[in-house]
A protein has these predicted regions:
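Residue patterns forming the tRNA-binding/recognition surfaces of aminoacyl-tRNA synthetases
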Residues: 1-46, 66-67, 108-110, 119, ...
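Protease-associated
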Residues: 50, 57-63, 67-140, 149-153
Length: 322
């Protein structure tokens, strides 16, 4: 959906505090510690590929006491400013801070996925991200490149690919060990249970917050990284031509010129594909086996001729052989 087609309504989400055990690090004082994250989307844990931190934030190693189910005498790591809030939300009081350090010490640190014994036995690197703040959570962000723009861009920068987490129906794909075949909105309870069984769950609860919904269907929305079709703004000088066209156009009111000009000056490549059942579809046939599009100019020209004569409804109603 386009941004203009998204509206925000109150929604109740499950929340979790869960840990990723450090497996490799350059800093001796970080060894054998557990990095704690907070998320309102437990269903994205199987899509996790990294943890994001802020090099300017101060973090603390907290030695836990005996009033938690899975973390007795273990060391956890959270942002220093958020210790009080996390301890209250996770209901533990028996702890002591044994060391405070700057976030840049996380460089070259690698963690294990909490589901490492369920088929998720890959490295989870810690990466610096300037989007990490102290507004909520633990100061360390669970990063799933398939399900968020910040996540995607940070992982892309470090060569981590987005996994094919789910299909078009919102069901975990075969690439997701243990949970494949489950609808993502029905998976939270399973994820929470397994995190507890893996002794990685520090706490969980619920949160009412503003959440994106489709303005047409009113259904809740999720971010999902998929292959799309783009028109480059740089090739064939499209951006330059568009800016010149704006300058050559008379605007009423005149202030509209600056608004659209600033939009074109900074916009990324133009995504022209959509996944929806209204509007004009792109005339593309895609192989069911390889998922590759049929790149045949003659066929595309034939479809264009049909559109000109009959409109686009035929794409949905006519025989594909036509």
């Amino acid at each position: 959906l386009a941004d203009a087609e998204v509206e925000y309504k109150d929604h109740i989400s499950n929340t979790i505090y869960t840990s990723f055990e450090i497996k490799k690090t350059d800093k001796d004082f970080l060894k054998k510690s557990h990095v704690v994250i907070w998320t309102t989307t437990p269903w994205t844990i199987p899509a996790n590929r990294a943890l994001a931190y802020n090099g300017k934030i101060k973090y603390s190693i907290v030695q836990m006491g005996k009033d938690t189910q899975h973390f007795k005498n273990k060391n956890i790591i959270i942002a220093s400013e958020l210790i009080k809030r996390v301890s209250e939300e996770c209901n533990f009081k028996d702890f002591k801070i044994i060391k405070e350090f700057n976030g840049n010490n996380f460089k070259n640190t690698v963690c294990s996925h909490p589901f490492k014994n369920l088929g998720y036995d890959y490295d989870v690197p810690m990466l610096e991200g300037d989007f990490v703040t102290l507004a909520q959570g633990t100061g360390i962000v669970h990063t799933a490149p398939s399900h968020g723009p910040d996540d995607f861009n940070l992982c892309l920068k470090h060569g981590l690919k987005a996994s094919n987490t789910m299909n078009d129906a919102g069901i975990y794909s075969d690439e997701i060990p243990f949970f494949s075949g489950t609808h993502i909105f029905k998976a939270d309870s399973q994820i929470i249970q397994k995190l507890s069984e893996c002794k990685s769950l520090l706490g969980n609860g619920k949160l009412q917050h503003s959440f994106p919904h489709s303005w047409r269907s009113k259904a809740p929305l999720v971010y999902r990284a998929t292959s799309q079709w783009f028109i480059s703004m740089e090739k064939k000088n499209l951006r330059k031509k568009a800016l010149k066209a704006i300058d050559d156009t008379v605007f009423y009111p005149e202030k509209g010129r600056d608004r659209i000009r600033s939009m074109i000056e900074t916009r990324p490549d133009w995504c022209i594909s959509r996944q929806r059942i209204w509007g004009v579809p792109l005339p593309l046939f895609v192989s069911k086996k390889t998922k590759e599009p049929l790149k045949d100019p003659e066929i595309i020209e034939n479809i264009a001729r049909i559109y000109e004569k009959e409109g686009s409804d035929g794409w949905f109603t006519d025989d594909p052989q036509k």
